[in-house]
């Protein structure tokens, strides 16, 4: 049956924040309405075109490719046109035109093409004049029919019979205003009319939710009237509705069908399109063979020298390595992948030549001898027992995939090299699309609907966070009853008056969730093509970059024929680079190229579980595993990196027990001992599964890789087929059927979690390198770690704690010592563990420094880590450099006014100055932080006045100097706790004083432990403890058991984390769980191989914990002065009301009568605070 109507103006969510339809929904709507075809015409881009085509074809629909573009007709005349691809030429021109809208240099007004662009790329395109948004409609709305006719003729001249007048009926006044004139011009010029309807949502009832989407786009609330809106009729109308709507213009309906019949191209998959690496003189095949053989000779020469291999053994090794090399080369060349290897080898060789650190390998590519020979990887595959077939299987053809790790700071240099070599038009990044996920969509919708912030924050906090698998709103409502109840008016807050609005927020969020919100770029993916990218895919260019971005997501870029190369920036390589640079400045060279992995100091450190900063070994559980494993070889580190994952983790105890000869390894069969010996009988690696199948059942390594894949996927049919092959092969090898089946079942269980050994070995080497640096050069290593985490105050806290544990001094921020980044001062003297962090004095005893005083460092900074100015909130490393350069040029700062006078006023603002003061940067220059904070407005005014006078020719030293004494306002001194929280606000950590320090004496009386007690002094069998801490961070997360909250707290010794799984605990103590709260928590404690786990059961404030306890204090003064101090303090704390928490007895020793002690029980009651116990502890018991 001939179709009745085809929608030609359907937009998807790739029209960012304009359409509420996904590609799948568009196709589903067309299919359910029995349309044989559907046109996708997104606003300004073709980002969804390939996804749309494949989805439509899969559903048996004809995809029609269109795009809505802005055309610049004149200097200030812009209008829309809908262009549709008639054939392949048209589609390629559509790619070029849509790409031009992003790659032009004049995008200030809007993304557009020029009229001349349409003339150049019109072939194969059908054009629809976009009614009221098109040039003809705009002219008619301006009552200029003559100009409308002129532009209609121009477009008709360009497109001929491929030009249509689009007509819509959304019941809008502007449409009705121009309709008659519009139809008349179409008739006069014989331009066919085509009926369309804007399709932005699926049904009329979605109009309100779509309106919210438009508000999100505009950044306004629904109450704001002067904003963009669309008609409620912009939904997917059925053919019947459209026919009825245009019953007076049946030809306009018929033309949708006619237009569809003119289109016969759909975007499709393409074979890989790589640049040709061949030259006139040599083919890719010959070139890779030549380079690989030369490279292997060089690798073996280095190997023989570094490993002291005897001359008589070298020839046999050469034979073995070259046999493997030739085997791999045959496969690579037969698969036509020589060019791929040569491209990767080229940019890695360039990187190494330029001194850019490249990872030893990543993924299965490290299993290739060819890759090793071409310098793509740095692991000897034969030495480490790695398999080529795991990377490139001759029995299952698929593209090889090298993921390359580069030093994070220099990754861009490598990309720029590739662009210069192959051409800017052939190299591009890959686009990614940010979606409206649960937390974000609730916040957006709540803001648009004017839901009070506290309710929006409450709702988003109920949605668990998962970085790997974001939780959908629907899933969150199933798993968090409180979220589902919130819409009904129930929850932690009193929702009276807001229940209906909250329900509307959640309902609307459910509709909008998952739509595309914006575009970004893939973190690592780079494509390199053999032709201009725009010939294959739409391209995009960010306004802030000149590099092309492929307009398809990674999945569809590869389907289109583009080959992705992952240029990954690995932060750890930057740590290694920076650490080696610091050491080189001290004349210390570290060469990892010839490392033998046998440094005792490194393994001794790891055996103690000191994994902070060590690649892969930083988690609590991993550190505990290191302590139990006691690694003594690189193979232990490789195995542990592979085992420490859900599933294989259960085999860690077996591995450890067998290593320490507490248990006999089970090799399953004597033939398998050589394969499983290095892992003590535990099947850890996927390569072991392949070897087992080869040795036991006669598989080729390629076929064994297919077996491994089947075991990993656990597809029943494939597993049954593979088991039959395995058993048959094992029987042929004189193994009984029952034993073969048993071994297959055992291996299948392990294989489901098997890890790629090539990847494990590559990353194990990086782990060893970082451990080596930390063990041998801890200060330089930790500074390198710190400098990559300037904005991560949790990490800074962690690394500084590690430095303190390693006896490294910490210099608090100091405007005359600190630089933009953390820095280290080396010393020949070993700093003992007992050394405490160097901190500024915070009392009134600091000497005030006048403007003329020569400032000297307040401590010996040799062997210390100096806190970075750039790690203070609101302060950038660039500002730190400005300060450092000024110090180098004109010496140390002598006062706060000297600082103000010497730095440009534009570089200093109120927040920056506030945080510099709060962090203690000026403590050496001025002893009263509170006074400086109160004086900020005057300091800034002084800065402006001083520099204005300097810039004028009327600068008066006397006049400005007369201002100086009046800058600082009078102020009291802040107490220690206030100063501590100043530091927390400025740096996210407590560096010179912790708020709980003064409570340590009373905590001992209250049986409240500190974190050091958890590791050292906890009696066996303890399962419940009381801890005190300051809440530093609060997160809501999701586990298999549902939502839970994690708190990060700190005490004077360390930071610690605890979990809250009970909704009742959350509800009862929500008022105590704010960041910066001082709390006592009663919690369950579990010690296992994952480390220490704390689960909160109840909370109390510090004050309540103290005040709810009655203390019986006994004092033993040794002289009159001590007695006077006791009595003075107690007199100030008399409180005979119910709030009291202490009684006191004083024992006086007679000076005349031996062994005579007078006991005086005071009748009064006292209300003591935390600091009181600290003061009195020297006199009491």
From Swiss-Prot:
The keyword Nucleotidyltransferase applies. It is found in: Cytoplasm. Signal peptide: none annotated. InterPro entries: DNA_pol3_alpha_NTPase_dom, DNA_pol3_alpha_thumb_dom, DNA_pol3_finger, DnaE2/DnaE/PolC, DNAPol_HHH, PHP_dom, Pol/His_phosphatase_N, Pol/histidinol_Pase-like. CDD domains: DnaE_OBF, PHP_PolIIIA_DnaE1. Its EC number is 2.7.7.7. GO terms for cellular component: cytoplasm. GO terms for biological process: DNA replication. It catalyses: DNA(n) + a 2'-deoxyribonucleoside 5'-triphosphate = DNA(n+1) + diphosphate. Its main location: cytoplasm. Keywords: Cytoplasm, DNA replication, DNA-directed DNA polymerase, Nucleotidyltransferase, Transferase. It comes from the Bacteria. GO terms for molecular function: 3'-5' exonuclease activity; DNA-directed DNA polymerase activity. The keyword Coiled coil does not apply. DNA polymerase III is a complex, multichain enzyme responsible for most of the replicative synthesis in bacteria. This DNA polymerase also exhibits 3' to 5' exonuclease activity. The alpha chain is the DNA polymerase. Belongs to the DNA polymerase type-C family. DnaE subfamily. DNA polymerase III contains a core (composed of alpha, epsilon and theta chains) that associates with a tau subunit. This core dimerizes to form the PolIII' complex. PolIII' associates with the gamma complex (composed of gamma, delta, delta', psi and chi chains) and with the beta chain to form the complete DNA polymerase III complex. This is DNA polymerase III subunit alpha. It comes from Rickettsia conorii (strain ATCC VR-613 / Malish 7). The gene is dnaE.
